[in-house]
């Protein structure tokens, strides 16, 4: 979902890099946060292979990583682009934990 903002550049996700390194604690913020169009900071959380594991856990892991590493300092707003057709409760985590003040539903 960040590819257009990053001028077609592919981005390594938090979970992909954590799997390669062995733990999310072994990642540096600058390795997963890229600056795109109009200086928008972009991060992809990533997730498990389809049918394996819970994609919501990826969102939880990524958001916690971003918070712990100061990604939310000096920003005007944060936008999460998440799937809405999945039964996993992990996708509701930003709402449940008070990380979202407003929610916009976009369908296509």
Curated annotation (Swiss-Prot):
GO terms for molecular function: 4 iron, 4 sulfur cluster binding; ATP binding; metal ion binding; nitrogenase activity. [4Fe-4S] cluster binds at residues 54, 88. InterPro entries: NifH/chlL_CS (IPR030655), NifH/frxC (IPR000392), P-loop_NTPase (IPR027417). Its EC number is 1.18.6.1. Binds 1 [4Fe-4S] cluster per dimer. Pfam families: Fer4_NifH. Keywords: 4Fe-4S, ATP-binding, Iron, Iron-sulfur, Metal-binding, Nitrogen fixation, Nucleotide-binding, Oxidoreductase. It catalyses: N2 + 8 reduced [2Fe-2S]-[ferredoxin] + 16 ATP + 16 H2O = H2 + 8 oxidized [2Fe-2S]-[ferredoxin] + 2 NH4(+) + 16 ADP + 16 phosphate + 6 H(+). Its cofactor is [4Fe-4S] cluster. GO terms for biological process: nitrogen fixation. Belongs to the NifH/BchL/ChlL family. Homodimer. The key enzymatic reactions in nitrogen fixation are catalyzed by the nitrogenase complex, which has 2 components: the iron protein and the molybdenum-iron protein. This is Nitrogenase iron protein. It comes from Desmonostoc muscorum (Nostoc muscorum). The gene is nifH.
